[in-house]
Each structure stands twice: as C-alpha cells, then as structure tokens.
Curated annotation (Swiss-Prot):
The gene is aroC. This is Chorismate synthase. Reduced FMN (FMNH(2)). NADP(+) binds at residue 46. One of its GO terms (cellular component) is cytosol. The keyword NADP applies.
Amino acid sequence: MNTFGRELRITTFGESHGRAIGVVIDGVPAGLPLTEEDIRKELDRRMFCHIHWLNPRCEPEEFEILSGVKDGHTQGTPIAIVIWNKKAISSYYDELWMKPRPGHADLAYYLKYGKFYDHRGGGRASGRTTAAIVAAGAVAKKLLALVGAEVAGHIVELGGVEVKRPYTFEDVKKSWEKPLPVVDDDALAAMLEVLRKNAAEGDSVGGGVEIWAVGVPQGLGEPHFGKIRADLAHAAFSVPAVVALDWGAGRQLAKMRGSEANDPIVVKGGKPGLETNKIGGVLGGITIGEPLYFRVWLKPTPSVRKPQRTVDLAKMEPATLQFKGRYDVSVVPKALVALEAMTAITLADHLLRAGVIRRDRPLKDPVV
C-alpha cells in the first residue's frame, strides 16, 4: 500500500515522470506552526545541486500546500502537498520499454502490474518520489520539536571510503555545512573524488548513513508488535535502495561477550540511564530516554552507462542495454534526507500513539 503510520498517517502518490508527486498527511493536531518555508528548507537539503554528479536533473522543487494549513498554522485536517515534476525527459526511456534494467524495480513491476506500469524514470519506484516523504518529514520534525526531540543524519561510508574518527551529535549537525554531510574532512575529500571518478566512468557507488534521534522521550514503543526498532526498520526499508540496517553498535555487538556488550546502568541527573549506550537507546523495543542511532546501507544506483545484460520481454530473448539518461552517481546523499524524514515521521506517530502529543484539542499558540 501507499500509506504509512497509525496515528500520524502519510499517503504518497505520483510517479517520476508524471505531472506531479505528493503526499497527504493525516493526524497532525490543529495549531502547529507550519509554513511553505518549513517544507522548502527540507526539500532544498535533498537537492545537492552543487555536486552535479549527485543530481543532474537538479529539479527546483515547485510545490503547493493544497489543504490543512491556514494563516501559518495547521487546521487539524489532512495536509495535502503536491510537488510538480518539471524537468523529466521521458524520451531517454523509449528504448528501455520491455527491457527491464538490472537492479531496478522494472522486472518486479512488470511481473506484478504487467504492461500497465510506468517505467519512465523508474516510475513509482524512483528515488524522485522520496521528495514527497521529505515534505512529510518537515511536518513531523515540527512535531518532534514540541517535545525537544530532533533528528539528524550523516554519511559514514561512500564508495568504500569510511569515516573513522570519533564524533558527537553536534558534529553530525554541523557536517551539513559542508558539500556533503561528512564529519571527517579527509573522508569527505576522498568521497568527492570517488564520485568524480565513477561519474567519468559511467558507473555508480553505494554506501552507508547514520541516523540520530536525540531528546526522544522514554516509553515509546511496545514489547512485541510495535517495537520502536521494528517500526523504524520498516520506515527505513520504505526508502528505495536500502539493503541493510544496523542498530546501535549493530554487528559489533554480535561479536562481543555479554559482559562487554551490556551498557552499565547509572544515575544521570537523578534518573537511571546508560553509561555507554551501545544498544542505541532502546531496550525491549521501548525507548529509555537515551539517544537513538542506527546505520542504514544503500546499494549503488542501478542506472549506469556501462552495457548490462537483460531480456527483451516482448520477444523473450537476451538483450543488452546501455542507459543514456541522467542518473545520480550515488543515491546515498538524497536517501539520507529521506531516511531522516521517515525516522521523524515514525517517532511523531509514536508520540501521538502514546499521548505525549494530543490531537483532540488545539496546540497552544505560541507552541512551547
């Protein structure tokens, strides 16, 4: 389906080369300050137009808030946001019809929808559609701010180049002042060179990002079906190109003995907390007031300019294709912004589920 969430529900729509993409957000309380600038700020973070290899389409996001907002505040009714597609060049995809691109969703969509699916630009499976997710994430981040919570992410690996130096949450936020959100300047320089090299060779690279959520209240999540980690994993895998997820110290925990893996419980400001937080802020599927953090791994962009083997579905014969359209050398930076958004949406949904934020009455104005 195309809807995510329980109390805060988002429904996305549209295809890469259709007239528009968009999102309907239901469950936002009345009285939340929200402007077009709030949406634009997040959409602009997704662009990376200053690095041509990451966004050759570089489409300025022309959007409209169609409903649910009046005089700079939400009304408590569904918020509809439409984002217009302006720079699609569909002719690039004429020769690809009935020749599924390896690594793309083309084959799966053909098997499920037959000849009725829109293959242009990847259609519904395109990374372009994550712009709608990012727009919804802008609203969710405003909800998180009501309780003093914030979400931020950064790139930890790109094309085999890894960030190895230690860092803080403040370092993660400041990394967005750089060409790419990378806390290590040496790693950043190497990543930019990897992007340049692969663009010249007509290839692509994958990588990994890390998402942080700080200030999240304790008690969110359920013991079994509705665990906060399970819901966040569901959210993460809703973003195109995601192939794996590590929570907290992740696979490193699996290599430790129990005495090493356990986080000592200590008193922090008169309350119980964790001394080390290798577990990533969640125990038993429930938040405990510590920072949440997890890493998400993404495959390389399937569209490359190198010849690839496929099948001509009309003839059921082997075929070779070579993509000639525009493509991102790496989906990692744009996916990072979408993953931030899905994290914020999931946490805001849990805040509403738990009654931390109520929607049976207007929020105070101004919001505190």
